[in-house]
């Protein structure tokens, strides 16, 4: 088992823009500063602990009894905690400003050292998977203390048919700091550094602020933002195509060596879900496109008084919706009250995120786009990142990410190995938190118009959560299959993506094509997890990663769970 580093299930003086005092992270619970003596101490201890672990256990795993194996597991968890703490600090600090060269260097240096120190541990999963099945079953049936770890090792043993020789696995571990990791970092830094000049706006905007304009009530503002996005993406499309081609080819090579039957296999194993389940969900959702997304967007066109929607109309508010900015204090109260209405303990678990610097909410130049909840390590606490702009969907995103955060806090007592959860299950926790907030808002609606606005927003979020994610899943599967046949041009990528979105949205009669669709590829930024020592990857990575949103939404679907995703 290689070290499983925690991953996020994204100028400190930026203005809150009338939203109230937006919080920023206080990372001192991890380390006080990049040059903190505690960080240097932990790096030295990590190097020593890894070397000692390999010296004590390599070649001996099959001989350990239950007591000896339990001690081995506990030592491995301690190493995971050390490495995870270091990389969590470096990664979170980087995502606050991905365009800062010093932060990027610090992250890369930490990643290089952690990778070097943990290379001796590559033997662990390889040797463990060679233990005979009967001996393995007996070992994990010996007592309750070791039996509780069996689910984690069952997932590890699922990789047994696909593991390579010890030497090749060590090479891949060493090589992980470049290749996909470097390409993902290039993609991240490029996206964070983009600037958009939108006619009518007083200054150039970053990606999050420009995307935010696509949900403005004034149609000319939405159209201007869409054209600005398309123009900037056009100037970068060759780079984005190169990133996608390279990552897809690298994955094809590794899958071929591992003899994985499909590009999706690795992701299904990671998500601990059977391929048949994924295929059944995919087929059911695709069959329902006409009844769901096609129907809804045709209805929305009617509400907006349009014969046909354009791309920039997809996230437009309804005409009767009041335009207002939701301040941070109101967003906090809304989410915490919603959580408390379900269980006071849930609100108690969420409250420290607001009070102790566990949330970074402001939109700033260089800050990574999107939102995430990062578990860090079980002996510290999670951190939540948002790009909060005061829209109703931003409140839902806050509720969603705090659902992750509460789940991560509840899981922490299980320890490093057992606190980690498949992404499909993780998304169930987050959409549950989001749904609590929606149901409370719906219960408080006093007029039919308020209810209509809330329900329409929930339908759109459900389309984004389940239906749209399946369309992206299909696109990723087709992308990887096509890349096996040769290099893909930007036009090849556009055609495949456009076909998937046409099926999803029902371009006729609801939508007209627009050049933004041909460039939508570069916004698919949550599809890989090889990047940054598995901290976060957002270029064209593993098909199936987006499936976790659809699965989470499906589980909560009877209550209308959702995942608010950016356009």
Question: Where are each of the predicted segments found?
Answer:
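A well-structured
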Residues: 1-321
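C-terminal, non-catalytic "cap/extension" segments appended to globular domains
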Residues: 18-21, 28, 34, 124, ...
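Long, K/E/R/D-enriched contiguous segments that form extended
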Residues: 301-338, 384, 407, 459-465, ...
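Acidic/histidine-rich catalytic neighborhood
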Residues: 316-318, 333, 415-481
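Catalytic zinc-binding patch centered on the HExxH motif and its immediate surroundings
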Residues: 324-326, 359-381
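Short pre-active-site segment immediately N-terminal to the catalytic Zn-binding motif
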Residues: 324-328, 379-399
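Amphipathic alpha-helical domain-onset/packing element
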Residues: 328-358
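Catalytic Zn2+-binding segment of zinc metalloproteases
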Residues: 403-417
């Amino acid at each position: 088992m290689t070290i499983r580093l925690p991953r996020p299930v994204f100028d400190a003086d930026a203005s809150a823009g009338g939203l109230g005092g937006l919080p920023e992270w206080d990372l001192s619970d991890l380390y006080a500063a990049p040059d903190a003596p505690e960080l240097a101490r932990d790096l030295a201890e990590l190097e020593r602990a890894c070397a000692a672990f390999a010296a004590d256990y390599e070649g001996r795993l099959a001989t350990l009894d239950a007591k000896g194996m339990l001690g081995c597991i506990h030592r491995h968890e301690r190493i995971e905690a050390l490495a995870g703490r270091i990389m969590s600090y470096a990664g979170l600090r980087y995502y606050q400003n991905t365009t800062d060269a010093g932060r990027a260097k610090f992250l890369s240096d930490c990643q290089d050292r952690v990778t070097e120190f943990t290379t001796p541990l590559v033997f662990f999963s390889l040797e463990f998977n060679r233990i005979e099945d009967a001996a393995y079953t007996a070992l994990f049936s010996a007592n309750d203390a070791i039996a509780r770890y069996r689910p984690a090792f069952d997932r590890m043993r699922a990789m047994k048919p696909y593991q390579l020789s010890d030497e090749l696995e060590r090479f891949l571990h060493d090589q992980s700091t470049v290749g996909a990791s470097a390409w993902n970092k290039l993609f991240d830094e490029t996206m964070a550094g983009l600037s958009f000049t939108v006619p009518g706006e007083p200054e150039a905007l970053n990606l999050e602020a420009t995307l935010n304009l696509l949900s403005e009530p004034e149609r000319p503002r939405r159209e201007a933002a869409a054209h600005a996005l398309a123009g900037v993406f056009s100037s970068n499309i060759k780079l984005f195509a190169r990133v996608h081609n390279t990552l897809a080819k690298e994955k094809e090579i590794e899958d071929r060596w591992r003899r994985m039957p499909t590009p999706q296999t690795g992701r299904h194993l990671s998500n601990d879900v059977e391929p048949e389940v994924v295929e059944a969900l995919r087929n059911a959702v695709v069959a329902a496109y006409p009844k769901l997304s096609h129907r809804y967007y045709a209805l929305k066109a009617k509400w907006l008084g349009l014969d046909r929607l354009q791309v920039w109309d997809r996230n437009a508010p309804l005409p009767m919706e009041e335009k207002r900015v939701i301040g941070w204090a109101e967003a906090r109260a809304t989410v915490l009250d919603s959580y408390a209405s379900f269980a006071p303990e849930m609100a108690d678990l969420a409250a420290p995120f607001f009070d102790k610097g566990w949330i970074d909410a402001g939109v700033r130049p260089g800050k990574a786009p999107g939102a995430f909840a990062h578990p860090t390590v079980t002996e510290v606490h999670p951190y939540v990142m948002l790009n909060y702009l005061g829209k109703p969907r931003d409140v839902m995103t806050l509720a969603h990410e705090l659902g992750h955060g509460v789940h991560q806090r509840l899981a922490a007592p299980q320890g490093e190995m057992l606190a980690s959860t498949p992404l499909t299950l993780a998304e169930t926790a987050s959409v549950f938190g989001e749904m609590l907030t929606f149901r409370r808002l719906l219960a408080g609606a006093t007029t039919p118009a308020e209810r209509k606005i809330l329900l329409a927003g929930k339908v759109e979020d459900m389309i984004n959560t389940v239906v749209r994610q399946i369309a992206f899943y299909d696109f990723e599967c087709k992308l990887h299959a096509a890349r096996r046949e040769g290099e893909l041009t930007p036009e090849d990528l556009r055609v495949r993506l456009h076909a998937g979105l046409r099926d999803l949205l029902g371009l006729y009669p609801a939508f007209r094509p627009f050049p933004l669709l041909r460039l939508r590829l570069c916004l698919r930024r949550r599809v890989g997890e090889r990047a940054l020592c598995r901290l976060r990857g957002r270029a064209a990575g593993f098909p199936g990663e987006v499936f976790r949103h659809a699965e989470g939404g499906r589980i909560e679907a009877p209550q209308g769970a959702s995942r608010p995703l950016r356009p």
